[in-house]
Amino acid sequence: MIKNAFISFQEKKEENRGSVEFQVLSFTNKIRRLTSHLELHRKDFLSQRGLRKILGKRQRLLAYLSKKNRVRYKELINQLNIRELKTR
């Protein structure tokens, strides 16, 4: 599973589970799992709401990381294969 591959990548930072990168990683895993669930169960509105909440949390964390350290942000975006944030 994708989760195991990313966690093995993050094992060197195992003591730092509160870091922004680890939180974004765990949110991304939850998002991918919920997305595959919603492909099968289209009318599961509670899961859709949970997905939107997790997407918002991840978006806020990525915005914080892009402001604080742009290099770490770019590396994380490339590792997780997600798009960059839209800037206003």
Swiss-Prot record:
Highest taxon listed in the record's lineage: Eukaryota
GO cellular component term, pick one: chloroplast
UniProt-listed Gene3D superfamilies: S15/NS1, RNA-binding
Pfam families found in the cross-reference section: Ribosomal_S15
GO biological process, one term: translation
InterPro entries according to UniProt: Ribosomal_uS15, Ribosomal_uS15_bac-type, uS15_NS1_RNA-bd_sf
Family matches, as SMART domains: Ribosomal_S15
Keyword line: Chloroplast, Plastid, Ribonucleoprotein, Ribosomal protein
Compartments where located: Plastid, Chloroplast
Main location class: plastid
Recorded GO MF terms: structural constituent of ribosome
Subunit structure: Part of the 30S ribosomal subunit.
Family to which this protein belongs: Belongs to the universal ribosomal protein uS15 family.
Name of the protein this chain belongs to: Small ribosomal subunit protein uS15c
